[in-house]
């Protein structure tokens, strides 16, 4: 199997001052192309360290994606490191220099002399175009390893990988068939509880069951070779059966996006009133393009479940909304949820059984509970659901 590695560069990445989203994206993207990463390394802006690791990985990896260090400043060292590792000099790529000058001219700017550095590549390098920025990429062969050098700006990096690097890999190597990866996301059951229920399932050869906990959800993944796809699809039915009503969506689209699509297809507008969640619901649904009619964040106040149910019913009527959803204030470890619909208003009062979680985590969990309440109503399910340390202590329905 082709041994593919990634090298992230930059002091800000090494020291945790920024999150390396490029590495996460590349690992996921390459995995679904049949090119799982076998190793990831991070090195700061130090020429000796960069040269050392390039020479080291050139003895082990077939392909190395180097990210970052192609800018115009003194701490951008990737091109010089590549040239030094190969024992050659840098040469000016005249065509890219002209392209950069055109790039700045079209934007009414004068190119700084420091940008000239971005057109200096190792003498043996293969030029790689960057259609969306000033940092071109390049490729060099060092010992057994084909190395691709890419810009750190995420939008530029992704375009280069998808449109320049992946086609080159397909030309030069015989790539394996992408693996099959089936995913679903659950809410309300713990990772250990799900694992205990699923451990008895017999997995086909080469197939693995994975769990990823990210408060407040658990993702289940069934991954295996394409040759086992039929057996995996059959097993997936058992996985969904065992997970039961804790399943909130399949795939990677996300619950807000699926709710948004369902609301649009059924021509339901939605109004929101949030206290404890502080606008988190509105943010998630608006980003997903949900048909939101009105949203408000109001100060927390102590109220009974009946009060929450009645005022969200009135709010739906006043706004002529298809649906209205409310999350009340948090008082004495209790919280109210209410959903006003054409079929009536459904309300739940829940109790937190622990105080060990932060405010942010509690808000995330409650936002997901509210979304799940909406999802369950849209799917003609009982709206009540619990989540480990959150217990439903009261429910009520107001008829139309």
Curated annotation (Swiss-Prot):
SUPFAM superfamilies: CinA-like, Molybdenum cofactor biosynthesis proteins
InterPro entries, sorted: CinA, CinA-like_C, Competence-induced_CinA, MoaB/Mog-like_dom_sf, MoaB/Mog_dom
Family matches, as SMART domains: MoCF_biosynth (SM00852)
Membership in a protein family: Belongs to the CinA family.
Protein's name in the database: CinA-like protein
């Amino acid at each position: 199997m082709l041994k593919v590695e990634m090298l992230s560069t930059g002091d800000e990445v090494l020291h945790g001052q920024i999150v390396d989203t490029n590495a996460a994206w590349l690992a996921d993207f390459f995995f679904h192309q049949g090119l799982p990463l076998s190793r990831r390394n991070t090195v700061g802006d130090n020429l000796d360290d960069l040269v050392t690791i390039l020479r080291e990985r050139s003895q082990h990896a077939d392909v190395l994606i180097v990210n970052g260090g192609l800018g115009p400043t003194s701490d951008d060292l990737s091109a010089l490191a590549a040239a030094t590792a190969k024992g050659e000099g840098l040469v000016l790529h005249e065509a890219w220099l002209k392209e950069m000058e055109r790039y700045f001219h079209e934007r009414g700017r004068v190119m700084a002399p420091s940008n000239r550095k971005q057109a200096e590549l190792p003498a043996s390098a293969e030029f790689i175009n960057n259609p969306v920025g000033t940092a071109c990429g390049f490729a060099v062969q060092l010992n057994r390893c084909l190395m691709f050098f890419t810009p750190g700006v995420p939008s530029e990096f992704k375009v280069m990988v998808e449109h320049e690097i992946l086609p080159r890999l397909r030309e030069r190597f015989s790539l394996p068939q992408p693996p099959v990866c089936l995913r679903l996301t659950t809410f309300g059951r713990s990772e250990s509880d799900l694992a205990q229920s699923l451990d008895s399932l017999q997995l086909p050869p080469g197939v693995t069951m994975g769990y990823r906990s990210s408060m407040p959800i658990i993702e289940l993944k069934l991954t295996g070779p394409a040759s086992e796809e039929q057996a995996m699809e059959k097993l997936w039915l058992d996985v969904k059966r065992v997970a039961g009503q804790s399943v909130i969506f399949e795939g990677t689209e996300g619950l807000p996006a699926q709710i948004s699509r369902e609301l649009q297809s059924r021509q339901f507008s939605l109004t929101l009133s949030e206290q404890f969640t502080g606008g988190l619901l509105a943010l998630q649904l608006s980003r997903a393009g949900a048909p939101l009619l009105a949203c408000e964040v109001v100060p927390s106040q102590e109220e009974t479940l009946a009060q929450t149910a009645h005022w969200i019913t009135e709010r739906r009527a006043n706004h002529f909304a298809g649906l209205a959803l409310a999350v009340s204030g948090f008082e004495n470890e209790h919280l109210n949820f209410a959903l006003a619909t054409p079929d009536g208003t459904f309300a739940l009062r829940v109790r937190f059984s622990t105080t060990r979680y932060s405010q942010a985590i509690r808000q995330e969990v409650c936002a997901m509970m509210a979304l799940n309440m909406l999802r369950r109503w849209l799917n003609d399910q009982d709206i009540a659901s619990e989540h480990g340390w959150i217990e439903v202590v009261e429910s009520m329905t107001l008829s139309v």
